Amino acid sequence: MMSITLENLAKLGASMIVDAEGMMSSSLESIAKKCAESGAKLYVKNAHKLMSIALERIAKAGKGNVTFDFSNDKKK
């Protein structure tokens, strides 16, 4: 699914679960911003695949509407 469609859904107030693997961090940031504007929630699976600066930008854009899932992080 194209991220522009996900952005439109978030703008309409649709909460969603997305997989960070294979998505650009800029797309996740845009979706998070739309979620913040509409009050929707964004749940990001495989968040350990993202760089820390990307996580910070997504979190800032989401203004408390983003949940990161690090549970699949097998690194020790």
Q: Which residues fall in each region the model found?
A:
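General marker for long, soluble alpha-helical cores
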Residues: 1-76
